Amino acid sequence: MRLNIFYILLIALCGLYGCKNHQQPIIKENLNILPTIYPEYQGALLPVNIAPLNFKIQDEGDEWMIQIQGKGNPITITAHDAVEIPIKRWRQLLHQNQGGSLSITVSSRKKGEWYQYSPFTWDVSTDSIDSHLAYRLIEPTYANWNSMAICQRELSSFKETEIISNKKSG
């Protein structure tokens, strides 16, 4: 009986932890420069059905807080390395901002203090992108030419499938 109560409390605590809100940090200084991100997406024009534009921040920092704002609920993400945008909330935000723009604000924590970079924007088109992209997958050195494949990627998600491969076709 005590073991059951323990597990129930543990599950409840995990659920409460998952529902925590991202509190806005107290900013020590506005840096008045754009963050260095890879790939460099600042000022991009986005089709309304594109997959999330995940990126890495190349500036120094112990922790990052990214806020993507437009019409509707903003997306707030904390990260230590790569910034991965939740796909469901991303799609909602893009559809709510068709023909408008999104403002992306990046803050970094360095030695316990928070610094905010200048925000940048992404414009959201009312047009959609084609559903798939086909490409040839081959090692960069061309040493393994016998392990080539023709693949496709769904551009509104990260789903990749192999169309044909040297290994399967002989």
Name every feature range the model reports, one short phrase each.
Residues 19-170:
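Sequence signature of WD/YWTD-type beta-propeller architectures
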